[in-house]
């Protein structure tokens, strides 16, 4: 099959990670894959077998989107691409428009609980809609076409395992985009109440809230305890040499970071949100998002006793199964 993947950018995030891993594996299985995005820091992680083309598919401008559609349509006609897989809302509009011009099918993967507004209008016109969790599917249920399913995202198996000798070192780690929805501000406030305890926090990620979070850590006198590393391609290695992952998100479509912690074996203190609860199997050691007092208590309990969630790997979707499921959707659409 000749498959086009469209996403806004290849900067830091779970959508980007998913598209990169899926595209790389599809080419290993003999398919031709073209990724269209505005580029970004993670672009170099695409396999040499994956074709990448830059277009401003991240811009929420109807004229720009139409021009992108015209360009993609010309590539489809000249090069024989067979199917479009869109990720995020602007790419969905572009895919719908392009499909109308070229008569090739398109599908959409919903990665998060987006606002229920005009941005989701194209979904009713998709050949298939994939949601990354039951939570996301339930959220967009009124926007779905006839054909839809849940395919949880997954990561290739990690090459590292957690070194349990780090449990007692109280070396916490946060991995994720620095936006309000990720909840790092709650953790920083909680840690501010524990600044006399023996701990450190490594923050891996970048985003619009970085400067504000750094300032707040400084105001609370935590600059010597919290290190903001920015984006790092060594997340797995650093997680394997940490004591515990802190995952304070307010909402997640799936939650690749705690899933990765499960693969590595790293203990987790996480928010009590539906996607995490399903992974963990119970709400023991889960904390309400935004609850500073609750996070303070959970972190102090870990420092004192080492207690945290150890995510069962059996609850984590396998990467091979995820790719198989996507491949099956592609095949079914092309055979119709």
Regions found by a protein language model. Name each.
Residues 231, 250:
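Aromatic "clamp/platform" in nucleotide-sugar-dependent glycosyltransferases that forms part
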Residues 65, 86-92, 110:
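Short His-centered aromatic/hydrophobic patch
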Residues 285-293, 300-306:
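Conserved acidic donor-binding segment of nucleotide-sugar-dependent glycosyltransferases
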Residues 126-161:
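Donor nucleotide-sugar binding/catalytic pocket of nucleotide-sugar-dependent glycosyltransferases
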Residues 100, 104-134, 142-143:
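A conserved, positively charged/aromatic
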Residues 16-21, 170-193, 208-214:
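A conserved mid-protein helix/loop that constitutes part of the nucleotide-sugar donor-binding site
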Residues 5-66, 207:
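N-terminal strand-loop element at the rim of the active site
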Residues 35, 267-270:
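Short hydrophobic beta-strand element within catalytic cores of glycosyltransferases
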